[in-house]
């Protein structure tokens, strides 16, 4: 796909109010067809931060180091209003708060998610060596790999994934390592940026870390993305790093990769929810 934008999108921007986003059918979530997918909420938070709080003149200097998205209410398939404000703007740190509201029948505007973004000013690493866990050595698929055709079962997927373990014959627990490539714009007519893409991939920490022999039976209440650099290229790799659960509460973490190596992590907390 060589065009500047994808044919399909998760949101249409309101014609009269640039803070209002109208979801398309592609944005529905896996738990309830009347609610939005978590990945589009985290993507929208990143879109807001980048659109209003990372000026073009400062993009080379500011690193989005953390994006936390608390999803404390189901997001209905209705118009979303996104607002943001600067909480702190210092010489080396900038903190942004994002609020996402939805129009709920008989209740009006209701806040359904809140996000906090921490932007840090880039400089140089201090001298010395620090221990880091070993990285995977799995090359991403080709940037020119064709997207699934209309007849392919993946053609209706809201992302394109390739598993490096697809040829392994031994039985494995589901969804441990994947390469993921976006197939939709977040906002119609706007090719998603690298930050928007990785904010959406970050939501994959839930199925990536919390799926097991019976599939996915945890629904995440948040996404917490950490980045020490921006991702490079179309493909982003997810590697399950941690899962722990007790009494129906779980924490799961994935490590994030691109063609140059590891660039961050994503962690979710989740509630047990059998399907």
Regions found by a protein language model. Name each.
Residues 1-275:
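Terminal targeting signals and extreme-terminal segments of soluble enzymes
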């Amino acid at each position: 796909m060589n065009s500047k934008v994808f044919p399909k999108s998760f949101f249409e921007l309101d014609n009269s109010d640039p803070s209002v986003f109208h979801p398309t059918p592609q944005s529905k979530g896996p738990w309830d067809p009347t609610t939005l997918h978590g990945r589009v909420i985290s993507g929208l938070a990143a879109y807001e931060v980048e659109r209003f709080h990372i000026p073009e003149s400062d993009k080379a200097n500011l690193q989005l180091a953390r994006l936390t998205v608390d999803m404390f209410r189901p997001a209905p398939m209705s118009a979303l209003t996104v607002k943001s404000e600067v909480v702190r703007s210092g010489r080396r740190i900038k903190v942004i708060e994002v609020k996402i509201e939805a129009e709920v029948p008989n209740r009006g505007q209701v806040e359904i998610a809140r996000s906090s973004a921490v932007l840090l000013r880039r400089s140089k690493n201090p001298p010395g060596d620090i221990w880091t866990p070993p990285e995977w050595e799995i090359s991403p698929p080709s940037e020119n790999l064709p997207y699934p055709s209309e007849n392919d079962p993946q053609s209706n997927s809201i992302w394109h994934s390739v598993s490096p373990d697809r040829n392994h014959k031994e039985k494995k627990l589901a969804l441990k390592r994947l390469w993921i490539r976006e197939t939709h714009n977040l906002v119609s007519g706007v090719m998603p940026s690298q930050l928007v893409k990785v904010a959406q991939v970050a939501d994959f920490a839930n199925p990536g870390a919390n799926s097991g022999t019976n599939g996915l039976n945890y629904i995440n209440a948040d996404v917490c993305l950490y980045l020490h650099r921006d991702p490079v290229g179309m493909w982003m790799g997810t590697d399950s790093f941690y899962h722990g659960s007790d009494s129906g509460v779980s924490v799961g973490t994935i490590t994030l990769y691109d063609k140059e190596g590891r660039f961050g992590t994503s962690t979710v907390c989740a509630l047990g929810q059998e399907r």
